[in-house]
Swiss-Prot record:
Lineage of the organism: Eukaryota, Metazoa, Chordata, Craniata, Vertebrata
Disulfide bonds, paired cysteine numbers: C90-C93
Thioredoxin domain mapped to chain residues: 61-166
Targeting presequence: 1-59
Native species: Mus musculus
The name this protein goes by in its record: Thioredoxin, mitochondrial
Record site feature (Deprotonates C-terminal active site Cys), residues: D84
Amino acid sequence: MAQRLLLGRFLTSVISRKPPQGVWASLTSKTLQTPQYNAGGLTVMPSPARTVHTTRVCLTTFNVQDGPDFQDRVVNSETPVVVDFHAQWCGPCKILGPRLEKMVAKQHGKVVMAKVDIDDHTDLAIEYEVSAVPTVLAIKNGDVVDKFVGIKDEDQLEAFLKKLIG
């Protein structure tokens, strides 16, 4: 109890009375925040670093952990899967990855996205004949039905996803 009082007094003396603006407002929007409480007349907001994102991207995108995980979540999936073979050092991958995640999220669960780092999962990259990154595969019922290499704009990605969903 004493710790809460001390924390409340400290926060009262440190935190400004203005609501978050600018960069902080954008960081706290679209997040699940803990309840606000009143400390000496001030409304205390949680730190943006302690918020939980609840965007659809988190629900439709996953990182492949190993070969059996790929088999279970991609090959055996009843939902069509877009597989993004990428690398940490790849510049175009850093552009395509978020763009592709956004487009997959817009499909509302009709397709999911698996991300495979080729440096961590060389065996999968070899098995699926990935010779350059980014390489994106469309897998439906365990079979590769489409593929592209390189960066694409949003219109091309949308057409790629629509073709996969059918």
